[in-house]
């Protein structure tokens, strides 16, 4: 079984330090992103950086189903959430009200909780080489979490000595994500219209937190997780050369680093 390597040399695939806690950057602070941010504020050591990015402002329609109060209306979501979590957990929480495309992303694990193709493309365009991106998306009562960090041309090789150092970016694993249009309604409005389960965002947030925890601890064997609330199932796709080969049409032998002597 392969496990995702957090820290490694992008040229040699030599693991440098797979036992450290990186910064985590959450892009999108609405439904799922709000639950993820709260969980990370508890999960991460206080000395480690937590950054929230969202240029949207809090509206009254967000109050019932997202992590905001009436006092937050008119504030940027990232600002309101960062200040609340900093006070709640007694830790620094940084935030940005600029779009991802306004500059390079900080180093660390990127958690994408956005709901449209252009936002995902912006994340992909501004990742550092080998920077892990955990993408979360959901429908009415189902969702997926995808993990990746590399374009196709960077995948040879990707696996070495039981570790997975590179996986295709989420938008390569599921190109249809780029075709997803921007939502006209918020998660709260979707719930009110019975177009979205009232618990799907919490469920997706919990899955994302488990993935982040396992990547940091060096125990994450997955590259995809699929949740179906109606069926009561959670289906993983393991991070293996065979799966990556099927997705990319790269030969398995090209994905595995030969043993060094």
Show where each model-derived region lies.
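Glycine-rich phosphate/adenylate-binding loop
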Residues: 1-8, 14-26, 30, 105-107, ...
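Glycine-rich adenosine-cofactor-binding loop
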Residues: 20-44, 51-59
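Conserved active-site and cofactor/substrate-binding residues in soluble primary-metabolism enzymes
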Residues: 35, 73-76, 80, 200-207
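Active-site catalytic pocket residues across diverse enzymes, especially alpha/beta-hydrolases
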Residues: 40-44, 67, 127, 216
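Glycine-rich phosphate-binding loop and adjoining beta1-alpha1-beta2 segment
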Residues: 49-89
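Hydrophobic/aromatic beta-strand patches that form the interior of the parallel beta-sheet core
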Residues: 51-53, 96, 111, 132-134
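A structured beta-alpha segment of the ubiquitous adenosine-cofactor-binding alpha/beta core
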Residues: 75-108, 114-119
């Amino acid at each position: 079984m392969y496990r995702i390597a957090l820290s490694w040399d992008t040229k040699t695939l030599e693991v440098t330090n797979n036992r450290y806690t990186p910064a985590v950057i959450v892009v999108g602070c609405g439904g799922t992103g709000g639950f993820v941010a709260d969980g990370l504020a508890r999960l991460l050591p206080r000395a480690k950086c937590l950054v929230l990015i969202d240029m949207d402002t809090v509206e009254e329609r967000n109050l019932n189903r997202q992590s905001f109060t009436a006092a937050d209306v008119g504030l940027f979501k990232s600002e309101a959430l960062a200040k609340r979590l900093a006070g709640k957990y007694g830790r620094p929480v940084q935030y940005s009200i600029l779009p991802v495309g306004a500059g390079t992303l900080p180093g660390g694990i990127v958690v994408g909780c956005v709901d449209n193709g252009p936002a995902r493309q912006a994340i992909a365009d501004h990742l550092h080489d080998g920077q892990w991106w955990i993408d979360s998306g959901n429908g009415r009562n189902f969702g997926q979490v995808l993990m990746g960090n590399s374009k196709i041309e960077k995948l040879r090789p990707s696996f070495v000595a039981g570790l997975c150092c590179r996986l295709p970016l989420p938008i390569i694993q599921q190109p249809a994500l780029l075709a997803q249009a921007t939502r006209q309604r918020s998660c709260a409005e979707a719930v009110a219209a019975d177009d979205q389960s009232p618990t799907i965002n919490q469920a997706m947030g919990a899955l994302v937190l488990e993935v982040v925890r396992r990547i940091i601890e060096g125990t994450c064997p997955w590259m995809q997780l699929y949740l179906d609330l109606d069926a009561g199932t959670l289906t993983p796709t393991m991070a293996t050369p065979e799966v990556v080969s099927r997705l990319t049409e790269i030969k398995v032998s090209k994905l595995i680093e030969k043993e060094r002597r």
